[in-house]
Amino acid sequence: MTQKFLICFPQGGINDMWSVMQQTINYCEREDRILVLDTTKNWFRDDWQAYFSILSPVVYKGVTPELITNLLKQDVFPSELQGKTHEELNHVIWVTEGHMSINGIHVSSPLHLSYKESVIVYAYCAMFRDIMQVFPKLQFTEEILTEFRRRRSMLPEKYISVHIRNTDNKSNVDEFIYNNRHILEKAPLFVASDNLNSIQRCKLEFNNVYSFSTIPDLGGENIHESSLSQKLRTTAEETRKWNSDAILDFLLLTQGEIILCSNYYSGFSMSAKRLQEAYSKNEIQPFY
């Protein structure tokens, strides 16, 4: 029997990408396909394999542009992408919620259906999906783990995690600080945010704030896909640091004694909160 494949281009932020990875792993397990993941056609603009691997028999190890080009020579759905090379595939475009396109071709076909073609091309942004299934399967690279340990060593043994989502999803930082002051002023704080002013506000308000990532002033624009954020990543090194900071902020948030979130519409916040609670109850094994 000829092996079938699903080529997936996960969209959205790191939490959304992990959610799509779990969604497509489940599909490939059910449909007996091999999952080929590519994160070079979205804001990440780098190979996910430089940051982590996924411990799953259906996830292809060692994905390359050449592999995808060769797969696209087979029987492909949607058929308009058959014969394309990886280089010819443009950046994925978000048309509307649940509708992504590549080269003007819809690539968010429903995954509750079966497809006869040998290769499916798929892109999606799985906002607010649960990552509790996929996260234990992630094995972070030594480079990520070394930097995580370095940053963790600079934090006190016990700290409170704070995540302020305040670009595309707005937060009332004044209200957040007012409502949580009785907690925030008593313990060391690790603060992660997509908004530079929010981090600076916490540092002005409290003298116990730790923050490591380089967050530029984007004027309230989306940290993932805005034109300004893309202009700030002109080299491979800048992209690698940008992506690593997002992952490392997430990992450090999960290790706090508690986690306070300013915006419950943020999937990044909610996933970090669920993992923090799971770690505090020893329900999952440490990633480090």
What are these regions (language model features)?
Residues 12, 22, 244-288:
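A donor-sugar binding/catalytic signature common to diverse glycosyltransferases
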Residues 8-12, 238-239, 243:
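Active-site rim elements
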Residues 184-189, 257-259:
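Short active-site oxyanion
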Residues 2-186:
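Secretory-pathway glycan-assembly enzymes, especially type II membrane glycosyltransferases
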Residues 48-57, 199-208, 271-274:
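Short, aromatic/basic amphipathic alpha-helical patches
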Residues 164, 186-238:
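Catalytic donor nucleotide-activated moiety binding site of glycosyltransferases and closely related
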Residues 167-171, 197, 267:
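Short acidic, S/G/P-rich loop/turn micro-motifs used as interaction or catalytic elements
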Residues 17, 21, 197-200, 268-269:
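Short, well-ordered alpha-helical microsegments
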